[in-house]
Design a protein with these regions (language model features):
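Active-site neighborhood of glycoside hydrolase catalytic domains
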Residues: 269, 274-373, 378-392
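Flexible, acidic glycine-rich loops studded with aromatic residues
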Residues: 367-373, 380-519
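Short, aromatic/His-centered strand-loop micro-motif at the edge of beta-sheets
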Residues: 571-593, 617
């Protein structure tokens, strides 16, 4: 009996030790990294291995989300997800759309619940929430490429701190191709950013155009039947493709806010109809006292808002209303009348009106409607956000000193200070005013790209280089708010592991270690690569031939690299209307090794291993008569130099994302080509 008791004690001790050891070694999965960060995570043990099957519960809307998810999964990881019916099995992904009150109360409009066990289940009470849940699964999957796209087991109930999370693109001063806007919708969706504002009209600065309003760049980018000839000729959107953009955005959970900016920033309209321009405040201002102004603007908005299927499909339309003169009380009151009129005019078509904050700058007596009006608070001197809250406006936090990008302008940010924003900012901070994190007056936050300096060499690729890290950062801060738990150092390192979006690579990032090698490049040859982004080196040996002007080495949809540029026959490149040249020509019969390197600041040419020329930023000055510098003459016969002290300058950029799509029709012999990226 004693022996049996001792044996039992030994067995019990062994079992306890085994249990202790197993508990000591067993680990639950820590919160995985995604952007925006999950608001909450309960880790479990082990990994989910996908079977390649998905199950849908919830009707047609859920089926549509599932099809989008399957297509994006294929594009991102290269594997098919196929639908199945019946009970899910281990490895299946289940999408559930349930609209009961309890789910709606727990998850809200955009929340979702993700449970990763033997089966992965995404549950939401709205289409938007279901879309966001699939974005999380996609981001988790792509970070496990080397492990077969497994997912860490655990669960989250995730919903945004702010209901509006967005970005504004200035398409008025610089045309942004529709292809990029479509990519931008997908990028924003991938990072759960739900609002894209498209600034459809604006104009350059008069001082860069000889101080002549008639010569100053101005554009309205949308097809217009009401006013034939109004639409910009250097790039525009047809109504049909603008509608298709909005439909695409709807699928991806993104709201498009179109903006027609009046009554300032309106030079495109006064170019078309000069009599509605202000003689007192400048032709970029509409004349608020001219009845023809209201007829014109009414007709413009009406074209895009009327009918059962209007061009502007979304719930919100932005009417501008920023930066008009407040020089006289009478003009302030008329500006307030104008603002109120167009808020109500837009609302008469069933839309919510949005405005730029201006009513502190234009403080007056004329009442301006505030109920259900969205106000973008960009500068507290123009609109005191706490006063605007008191008046009843719904605020969008877009403080210029923190979240405005003006590429290469030398004022505002060229690249946002993402570390400061990540560590210290949320939409509750508008300029120097701090609101409570849950203040219902604040709808959310946005950032913006303003293309102020027309003609400064900035391309869409340059804009994208500035935009994308800001998008990732604002995504985190508008969804997770003040509750981010990853350090900025970890965030900044780990964000690089994520794609821009499924099947989107606007930066032309190559996988680490990838190279393109071509032993002999033949005229007209395709390479299988469209382009290579910043941080590249393109090297080749060339035995020169007599190349006529315009001879192309490589071209893509975005750029052309010339062996002999069309103007002077030098090595150079062109994109988006800009032509940049190296002071170098291909010499007939001469064999050299050339290398071109490029980053976000410069493009360099090396000849036989030595730097020949660096094309970096160049400061250009507007030489205006008012800037003529005069000096006292020392005597009656002394001559006076003609010199200027320029008040206006821009920084011209000469960057290049190198094209590789197709070789040109050249005569030279090109061998030993190697392309790589840092």
């Amino acid at each position: 009996m004693k022996k049996n008791l001792n044996d039992f004690k030994r067995l019990l001790l062994t079992a306890c030790c085994t249990l202790v050891l197993s508990c000591g070694w067993a680990t639950v999965n820590e919160k995985p990294f995604v952007i925006p960060e999950l608001k909450q995570w309960s880790g479990a043990e082990g990994m989910f291995t996908p079977s390649g099957k998905y199950v849908v519960k919830g009707g047609k809307n859920a089926q549509d989300v599932a099809k989008l998810f399957a297509a994006d999964y294929r594009d991102l990881v290269g594997k098919l997800l196929t639908p199945k019916t019946g009970k899910p099995s281990a490895g299946d992904i289940v999408l559930v759309l349930q609209s009961d009150r309890k789910s709606a109360r727990l998850l809200g409009k955009e929340g979702y619940r993700l449970t990763i066990g033997d089966v992965t289940t995404i549950t939401a009470s709205s289409v938007e929430g279901l879309v966001w849940g699939t974005r999380t699964v996609l981001q988790l999957s792509e970070q496990q490429r080397s492990a077969g796209f497994v997912l860490p087991k655990g669960s989250t109930q995730d919903k945004p701190a702010y209901g509006l999370r967005g970005f504004m693109m200035d398409c008025g001063r610089k045309f942004i191709p529709m292809s990029y806007l479509r990519s931008l919708v997908k990028m924003m969706s991938y990072y759960k950013m739900n609002t894209l504002q498209i600034h459809l009209n604006d104009n350059g600065f008069r001082q860069f155009f000889g101080n002549d309003w008639a010569k100053t760049q101005a554009a309205f980018r949308l097809e217009c039947d009401t006013y034939p000839g109004l639409t910009a000729k250097d790039g525009s959107y047809s109504k049909a493709e603008f509608i298709e953009l909005q439909k695409l955005a709807e699928q991806y959970g993104v709201n498009i806010i179109p903006e027609i900016d009046v009554p300032a920033h309106s030079l495109a309209f006064t170019h078309y109809k000069p009599e509605i321009g202000s003689k007192e405040y400048g032709m970029d201002h509409l004349d608020l006292f001219n009845p023809e102004t209201y007829k014109f603007v009414d007709g413009l908005f009406k074209e895009y808002l009327e009918g059962k299927n209007p061009v502007f499909r979304g719930k919100v339309v932005h009417i501008g209303t920023d930066e008009y003169s407040n020089a006289k009380k009478e003009v302030v009151e008329k500006f307030r009348y104008f603002t109120d009129h167009y808020i109500k005019y837009v609302e008469s078509f069933g839309k919510q009106a949005a405005v730029w904050g201006a009513l502190t700058h234009a403080k007056g007596d004329t009442k301006v409607k505030s109920e259900n009006v969205m106000m973008h608070c960009w500068y507290n001197g123009y609109a005191d956000p706490k006063e605007m809250k008191r008046q009843g406006y719904k605020l969008v936090s877009i403080p210029d000193g923190l979240v405005y990008i003006v590429p290469a302008a030398g004022y505002y940010y060229d690249y946002l200070n993402c570390q400061y924003l990540y560590d210290s900012w949320t939409p509750a901070q508008i300029g120097n005013e701090k609101f409570d994190e849950n203040d219902p007056a604040i709808l959310g936050g946005m950032f913006a790209v303003w293309n102020d300096h027309v003609g400064n060499g900035i391309t869409v690729k340059d804009i994208h280089d500035r935009l994308f890290p800001a998008l990732q950062t604002l995504s985190a801060k508008c969804w997770t708010g003040a509750a981010t738990s990853f350090s900025f150092e970890d965030f900044n390192r780990l964000r690089l592991s994520l794609s821009e979006a499924p099947a989107v690579n606007e930066a032309a990032r190559w996988q680490k270690g990838k190279q393109l090698r071509i032993e002999t490049l033949n005229p007209g040859q395709t390479t299988g690569e469209k382009e290579v982004g910043y941080g590249y080196r393109v090297e080749f040996t060339i035995e020169g031939a007599d190349e006529p002007k315009g001879t192309v080495l490589f071209s893509s949809d975005n750029a052309t690299f010339y062996l002999a540029d069309p103007e002077s026959g030098q090595l150079g490149f062109a994109h988006e209307g800009y032509l940049n040249k190296f002071n170098y020509r291909i010499e007939k019969g001469k064999k050299v090794t050339l290398a071109i390197t490029g980053d976000n600041r410069k493009t360099c040419l090396y000849v036989d291993g030595k730097l020949r020329e660096e094309l970096g930023p160049v400061t250009l000055y507007a030489m205006l008569p008012k800037d003529l510098a005069t000096f006292q003459k020392s005597d009656a016969t002394a001559t006076q130099p003609i010199v200027y002290n320029p008040s206006a300058k821009m920084h011209y950029q000469r960057t290049l994302v190198f094209p590789l799509q197709k070789a040109g029709d050249f005569k030279s012999r090109i061998t030993g080509m190697k392309v790589e990226q840092e």
